[in-house]
Amino acid sequence: MTTILKHLPAGQRIGIAFSGGLDTSAALLWMRQKGAVPYAYTANLGQPDEDDYDAIPRRAMEYGAENARLIDCRKQLVAEGIAAIQCGAFHNTTGGLTYFNTTPLGRAVTGTMLVAAMKEDGVNIWGDGSTYKGNDIERFYRYGLLTNAELQIYKPWLDTDFIDELGGRHEMSEFMIACGFDYKMSVEKAYSTDSNMLGATHEAKDLEFLNSSVKIVNPIMGVKFWDESVKIPAEVVTVRFEQGHPVALNGKTFSDDVEMMLEANRIGGRHGLGMSDQIENRIIEAKSRGIYEAPGMALLHIAYERLLTGIHNEDTIEQYHSHGRQLGKLLYQGRWFDSQALMLRDGLQRWVASQITGEVTLELRRGNDYSILNTVSDNLTYKAERLTMEKGESVFSPDDRIGQLTMRNLDITDTREKLFGYAKAGLLTASSATGLPQVENLENKGK
């Protein structure tokens, strides 16, 4: 059985991930007119720029959908977002600012939950709006087939018949109007935006050029912190975790993770926290550029890692960062539920996140400017009295340190001999050995 269908399978049921925008609206109407039986599935991901979810399935029915369903994905999305924070599953970082993989997390949830809903309806062909140059086409392909082994893929944007007839937004708008729908194109922005409750992605068009900065972006989850006319008063915030799970913000305990994430977004968004500008490597190894918002994820991540550094030892923290980067890359590639990802997730959540209990107090200012004011946890291995510079009772003596210096640094002789060997081989010279003031002596010794 062919997995990817290049042309419309007339007479068959096709599930389309329906956003209600021009692209999917025109595609749904076109498929119905060409003899297919479209079913529309809309994911409620808590998008900050969506006002009326209930209206989307109604529009799908007007455009010819056999049936239209709204699937609430918010709870699962937030659960995966918290798991990503617990595991540090983020691999794109520039200048200390992190991309929190919010789009890959959204695709993992959408790709599995929508296809599961389609399977319930006996729909085994899936279409969506992803293009062949991007990451999403592969993410949806993997998650869809993972959920339904019998799934076939039909994408209008890979169908030459569709492209020839409706290859651009102007053509799609004219098509909708000609069919009796007063569909006016939204005002063209200088970039495109995709969002869910965890974060927003701004990319393409003017943002493909690196001389276009964050200043052309209108944030949908935060504020223009770079604009000095925007008043942003400093704010003190507390974040509490219990066994790796965020449970309270500013002393308010949340039993609903969705409400907790919404509040974290509001708090961080007031300051523009979590915005970053990234050049990244797509799955196909071509570089792309995006400007990202993730105020709630950033707030929780900062507090989580503060507790992490005070609770776990150096080697555990190193493994957390190393394994987290590996996991972040797998998430980005659409492999969040693959065995290698589950193995990394299990270890990080079981042995690292389970010990993260405590409260962090921060002062948020503008953008990513903040200070940590206090860190409290019964699990802290940081003990001020152990290394106090003041006179008093100590857990170890000067003699203990002398022994440690002797035993820990027995390799100094070996290192000296290595440098001598490098100089003798001509690999180190006085002109090249910056930071090694004794290299001339080594050269003389070599002679």
UniProtKB/Swiss-Prot annotation:
An MF annotation (GO) of this entry: protein homodimerization activity
Binding site for L-aspartate: T131, N135, D136
Residues at which ATP binds: A17, F18, S19, G20, G21, L22, D23, T24, S25, A43, G129, T131, D136, D194
Cellular localization per UniProt: Cytoplasm
Associated pathway: Amino-acid biosynthesis; L-arginine biosynthesis; L-arginine from L-ornithine and carbamoyl phosphate: step 2/3
Catalytic activity from the UniProt record: L-citrulline + L-aspartate + ATP = 2-(N(omega)-L-arginino)succinate + AMP + diphosphate + H(+)
SUPFAM superfamilies for this protein: Adenine nucleotide alpha hydrolases-like, Argininosuccinate synthetase, C-terminal domain
PROSITE patterns assigned to the protein according to its UniProt record, in alphabetical order: ARGININOSUCCIN_SYN_1 (PS00564), ARGININOSUCCIN_SYN_2 (PS00565)
Subunit structure comment from the entry: Homotetramer.
HAMAP family with a match to the protein in the record: Arg_succ_synth_type2
This protein's name: Argininosuccinate synthase
Source organism (scientific name): Salmonella typhimurium (strain LT2 / SGSC1412 / ATCC 700720)
Species classification: Bacteria, Pseudomonadati, Pseudomonadota, Gammaproteobacteria, Enterobacterales
Gene of this entry: argG
